[in-house]
Amino acid sequence: MVRESKSPHSSPTFCVRKPNGKWRMVHAFNKLNTPTIPASTTIPRKDVLQNNMAGCTVFSALDMVDGYYQLLMRESDIPLTAVSTPSGMLWEWLVMPQGLSNAPATFNRLVTQLFRPMRQFVQTYFDDIFVHSRASEGKTAVEAHLGHLREVLLCMRENRLYANINKCIFGAEEIPF
């Protein structure tokens, strides 16, 4: 995820406590983010996603593990992500760290593009993937849903994307959104 760096760039890093009591590493990429041109991408609207799932009777929700960390940085951009630790070490990210101004848009664009061919039964919202099915073409909703899940999981496997099994919901009549 990181390697030791000799980059001339450096952003400070520190830890903050998350609501669940665990710690999250945070980077102050202010100097890097200030001149960054914001990505022009649309943010998914929850009401549109919910409308696209209307009429379905079987749902699954997959939560991707550390979403940004699943995206490799472009080699030429790696030195820009260098962070200094309180101990004086300098590290650079090989994967996309949290805190980059265009990280959410970049991640969302990737997930949206990957699952676009499945948009009839998949909705994505950043690191959440919602699979929704109804009975059709002589298949029950459950049979259709199993086929949809296979397609989604195969796409994830082919693209080396991983879900947090502890946060996933499979084959439910409803899911929290």
Residue spans of the language-model regions?
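Retroelement reverse transcriptase polymerase core
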Residues: 1-177
